[in-house]
Amino acid sequence: MAPNIRKSHPLMKMINNSLIDLPTPPNISMWWNFGSLLGVCLATQILTGLLLAMHYTADTTLAFSSVAHTCRNVQYGWLIRNLHANGASLFFICIYMHIGRGIYYGSYLYKETWNTGIILLLTLMATAFVGYVLPWGQMSFWGATVITNLFSAIPYIGQTLVEWAWGGFSVDNPTLTRFFALHFLLPFLIAGLTLIHLTFLHESGSNNPLGVTSNCDKIPFHPYYSLKDLLGFMLMLLPLMALALFTPNLLGDPENFTPANPLVTPPHIKPEWYFLFAYAILRSIPNKLGGVLALAASVLILFLSPLLHKSKQRTMTFRPLSQSLFWLLVTNLLILTWVGSQPVEHPFIIIGQLASLSYFTILLILFPLAGALENKILNY
């Protein structure tokens, strides 16, 4: 019998083992769809980004007008830009859902997969931040100024570090040039890290909603989940197209339609919606260094998830107490996101401080306590 090229060719064999003959649990739900959705998001962003980079000029005098030129004069330039800008929002929706799924179903117990995932999240956040600076509007410029300035809170080396990052004494041409270089490079780093993430995942196999081993009755990825993923792609493409074609500027800041001006500060400097929860945590601490540490901790705390798992059951499927805490955490994050978009005044200050406190309390104290308590109730 002739050898099956799909199973014998070195490259085809890798693709086959990852996407076709991959043994998959038979009971994974739509929550397991977000991994492949993130892959599609990344591919879309790289493609649209490449097309935009062909028409973009990384210079302070030309950046803003080069983006305007792309939208006005390039064939479908407006569509490419709208897809790229709103694709970023969808990317973050998917990654937050993906992380939420990981927390709910105890996927963080695959430590290597979880840790590479968090590194991916940090890289994605860095990419989105430097990308937001490129159109060189008011919010781009002031966002870059505020966020890079946070590094000056680092004792002893802070100021030197910031000036080194800026390439001068303020955010200017060298900053824009290096941010463009980084924004071009980082997505390829993300693609590389994704392969590492998948390598670790395929070492252990996928988790499932019950959190029990499913080795005895796994099914091939194709055609079952390839088709199920295709449905996910369609459902994701729908809101993306609706956003890009009907309300392309819904999630953007109107301030960014004004070219960057170092002499005029916008009344409310705020990042894109997907960073607002972290921004609210940063603002809720009146001390600069304290705020920066809290900001870093808000994401880095995810590294502790495997250590804080005290329950004898892996998933939250049969743990109502932990479930309630999980949804409390989700609500809390939504409140933080809302507070981050509001001006710094009463009552938003105190709401932000309480929400920040409860964010860390739920993750660090209440989750482990609930897990231990549930063990006791169930006589484990």
UniProtKB/Swiss-Prot annotation:
Additional observations: Heme 1 (or BL or b562) is low-potential and absorbs at about 562 nm, and heme 2 (or BH or b566) is high-potential and absorbs at about 566 nm.
Membrane topology listed for this record: Multi-pass membrane protein
Entry's localization field: Mitochondrion inner membrane
UniProt binding sites for heme b b562: H84, H183
Annotated a ubiquinone binding sites: H202
Tree of life domain: Eukaryota
GO biological process, one term: mitochondrial electron transport, ubiquinol to cytochrome c
Positions that bind heme b b566: H98, H197
Organism name: Falco sparverius (American kestrel)
Family: Belongs to the cytochrome b family.
Cofactor note text: Binds 2 heme b groups non-covalently.
Listed CDD domains: cytochrome_b_C, Cytochrome_b_N
UniProt-recorded name of the protein: Cytochrome b
